[in-house]
Each structure stands twice: as structure tokens, then as C-alpha cells.
Amino acid sequence: MKLQKPKGTQDLLPQDSAKWQYVENFTRSIFKQYNYAEIRTPIFEHYEVISRSVGDTTDIVTKEMYDFYDKGERHITLRPEGTAPVVRSYVENKLFAPEVQKPAKFYYMGPMFRYERPQAGRLRQFHQIGVECFGSNNPATDVETIAMAYHFFEELGIKDIRLHLNSLGNPESRAAYRQALIDYLTPLKEQLSKDSQRRLEENPLRVLDSKEKEDKVAVENAPSILDYLDEESTVHFEAVRSMLDNLGITYTIDTNMVRGLDYYNHTIFEFMTEVGGNDLTICAGGRYDGLVTYFGGPETPAFGFGMGIERLILVLEKQGIELPLDTQLDVYIAVLGQEANGGALDLVQAIRKQGFRAERDYLDRKLKAQFKSADVFGAKAIITLGGSEIESGQVVVKNNQTRSQVETSLEALKTDFASILEELEKQ
């Protein structure tokens, strides 16, 4: 058997991980501006944490979860999404306590797992960045969170982003609409796909966002959920729309958008862009005011979103957005002979301790091969160190782009490399 990675996974090689690190660090800097703090939860949870919160009839639970019984016969699942684990942690660690400032804002990033058909931007192990905000039912919280995602895309340079917006209302509005949708779809049941025929019995709202052609035709004239919002839900949604307008964030009302998870209420949204002629959702979320209670906590309004890192990277590449990656070496030390081996190690360590990125040759190669390595690493400067340099204590530092050079002492390099590099870059 040939040993290779499982289907639907990928190896992140150094040339790729540099992009990921940039996006992750950029994310942290944006979220920090909005006063979000990082939370980390296990990558596996008890099965019920996901099944009961996400919804027993959702595709995630019925088709996509990686679940198993461990050696203690506990039913475990690899996490398929980030919200339920964070809510579980919020309740278990009593973060609803009065001494925790509200709204309590958390972000996370890490791997998720779903058994799906692998394709561009969709893997069985994928990585998600998400935020969860607890303790505010103010529609301004909805808008701030959406605006934070918009701000993130804007600063990252992603173009042609479209915001789709809808409201699922409160439980009473949703129940009224659910019945209206059942009444509309029941006469059309035989025209629906097999999955949607099942959804009609279990969770009819899920028929609305089916990707099957026959289902799309069937729901073309379906009633709009906005017609079933009660006064409370209508006021909330109108406030969200008004504040988005004031911020200059354009959006499209999409009444067929219901999101794939059962815990949402009131505002839901998706950010989409086009990749290869197809619409790709790169960020989605909404309000989930009942989930904390469902996990045994006090009544707590909440709002959040998730976005896939793989999809973000895909969009950046497709749009030709060059990330300002800092992959250059500051200096490469070419080593001439074994007599310079120990001295080269002393020097490279001293330069690193000053905060610079440095490398040296360890393979006892010819100078030409070492200089080629310096070019591959993008080294700003090259130091050639041999027995004579060790003996005299004097070395030549060359600018690897302009070929200008300065002569200095080994001691100066070990204590003030910054001044030498600055002088070299001025020439």
C-alpha cells in the first residue's frame, strides 16, 4: 500500500503556509480592533454537542460528520463547525457570569471535518476562522459583526464581494412561516428531489437552499419569510438594514437563504464572490439567541460567523492578490572550509539573537552553490567566512542585490548588525 494523505486533505508546504500565516495574523489584527479575544476548543466533542445544536436532520449530522465510539464507548465526533463547541465552552466555563464583560467577544481558528465530496475550496479537513459575540440583542451588534467581516475583506484587497441578507425572525415568526411553506410545497412534493422530500417532512426551510435544479424550480414562487415576520422581528431587521445603509455596505435581500444549521434566528447573512464562473460563499453567519439556553445556560442572545481559510486563499489567488509576505533572509553566511565551521555557527547565532533572519551553509559546498542558495532564499546580504577571516577578525559583507560591500569586524557583526545592514542598503 502506498502511504499518502487521506482523500479530501492537503499538505501545507512552506510556500503555502507563509500565505496562511499572513492571513491568520491579519485576521487577529482586525479582530483585535473590535475587542475580540481568542478561544480554543478541542477538535473533537461529544456527538450530542453537535447533533442536538446543529440539528438532527441537517446534512452535517445525517451525512457529513466523522463520528466514532472511543475506547470508553463514548460517542465522539470531530467538530464539523465552530459555533456549537464555543457555546458549549461558554456555558461549561460559566462565561455568562456577571464578572465577564458583555458583550463577550471570542474568535477562533482551526481545523474542522466534514465527509463531503472534495472539490476546489471544499475539503474533508478544512480550516475555519470564526467569531462569536454573546450578550447583546442590539441590531447594532449584527451590523458591527457583518461590518467587521466586510472590513476584513476590504483591507485584504478582495474585490467583487456581495452581501446576501435575510431574516428568519423569532421562533413564532419562523413557526408561522414553516407551516405556510409546508402548505405550499406539499402539492409539489413529487417534483422535489429525494433529499428535499425528506426535508419537507423534517425541516421544510432547508428545501429553500437546495442546489438541485428541480428544487430550485419548485421554490421559485414560494412565500417569502419576510411576509411572516411579526412586529418584533420586522423592527429588528429594518434596524439592521438601516444601519448597513448608513455604513455604506450594500446588500441583496435573499429570502431563499436559510443557512444549513438549525440554530439561527433573526439576521442571517453570507458574503459571496465569483470564482471560475460559480458563486462561492466565503463567509456566513447570523444570530442564534436560543443556543446558550439549549446548552443549559441562561437566556443569552448571540451573533457570529465563520469563514473558510482554504476559500479565502483560493479567492486571493484567483484575484491575483499578492500578499506582502516577509520570506527574505537578512543575511546568508557562506562558509569556506572546516576551519570556519565553528566560527560561522557563533556568528549566525549572534545575528539571530539581534532579531535578524539568518542562515549559513552546512553542506561544505563550493562557493557558487552557496551563493545560489543565498539567491533562492532572497538574502539581502552575504558574508563569506573562511579561515583567514576567522584569523583576522575582519569580514566583507556584500549587498546581494547591488553587489556593493562594506568591510567590518566580526565583533561588530555580533553586536550591531543593524547598523551594518543599514549602511549596506544605503549604498
From Swiss-Prot:
One of its GO terms (biological process) is histidyl-tRNA aminoacylation. Keywords: Aminoacyl-tRNA synthetase, ATP-binding, Cytoplasm, Ligase, Nucleotide-binding, Protein biosynthesis. It is found in: Cytoplasm. GO terms for cellular component: cytoplasm. It comes from the Bacteria. GO terms for molecular function: ATP binding; catalytic activity, acting on a protein; histidine-tRNA ligase activity; transferase activity. Homodimer. Belongs to the class-II aminoacyl-tRNA synthetase family. This is Histidine--tRNA ligase. It comes from Streptococcus suis (strain 05ZYH33). The lineage of its organism: Bacteria, Bacillati, Bacillota, Bacilli, Lactobacillales.
